[in-house]
């Protein structure tokens, strides 16, 4: 599936996609955080209505295309380090980085595809 997203998505994201089932708003928190190498980092995403497990987590670095980390809420994309994990279903989802590495400093965001047009 081609999941193109604007490059300017940063920080707190309020994402919605029109579709047959009503627009679904995604709210991510925190909007920003300070962390150090070795820290455990948790980012949450809440849907305005249930989306089963139809959620992906992406990493984006400046000037680079978004990289899919987690699909179907908790499945690790091939080649992604095991320190990344995802959990949740319905409306509440979490991305966890178990031990932050220097290459992990980036923007992270969730994207639902429950009602992808």
Swiss-Prot record:
Disulfide topology: 45-110
Region (Framework-2): 57-71
Biological processes annotated in GO: adaptive immune response; immune response
Main location class: secreted
Any one annotated GO CC term: extracellular region
Entries under PROSITE patterns matching the protein: IG_LIKE
UniProt subcellular location: Secreted; Cell membrane
Residue ranges occupied by any Ig-like domain in the UniProt entry: 23-117
InterPro entries (alphabetical): Ig-like_dom, Ig-like_dom_sf, Ig-like_fold, Ig_sub, Ig_V-set, IgV_Light_Chain
Signal sequence, renumbered to the chain: 1-22
Chain residue ranges for the region called Complementarity-determining-2: 72-78
Domain of life: Eukaryota
Keywords: Adaptive immunity, Cell membrane, Disulfide bond, Immunity, Immunoglobulin, Immunoglobulin domain, Membrane, Secreted, Signal
UniProt region (Complementarity-determining-1), positions on chain: 46-56
Region (Complementarity-determining-3): 111-117
Subunit and interaction comment: Immunoglobulins are composed of two identical heavy chains and two identical light chains; disulfide-linked.
Protein name: Immunoglobulin kappa variable 1-6
UniProt organism field: Homo sapiens
Gene name of the record: IGKV1-6
């Amino acid at each position: 599936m081609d999941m193109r997203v604007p490059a300017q998505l940063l920080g707190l994201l309020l994402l919605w996609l029109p579709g047959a089932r009503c627009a679904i708003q995604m709210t991510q928190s925190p909007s920003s955080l300070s962390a150090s190498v070795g820290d455990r980092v948790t980012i949450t995403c809440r849907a305005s209505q249930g989306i089963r497990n139809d959620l992906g987590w992406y990493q984006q670095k400046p000037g680079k295309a978004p990289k899919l980390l987690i699909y179907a809420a908790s499945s690790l994309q091939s080649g992604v380090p095991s320190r990344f994990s995802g959990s949740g279903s319905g409306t509440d989802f979490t991305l966890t980085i178990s031990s932050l590495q220097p290459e992990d400093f980036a923007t992270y965001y969730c994207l639902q595809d429950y009602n992808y047009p």
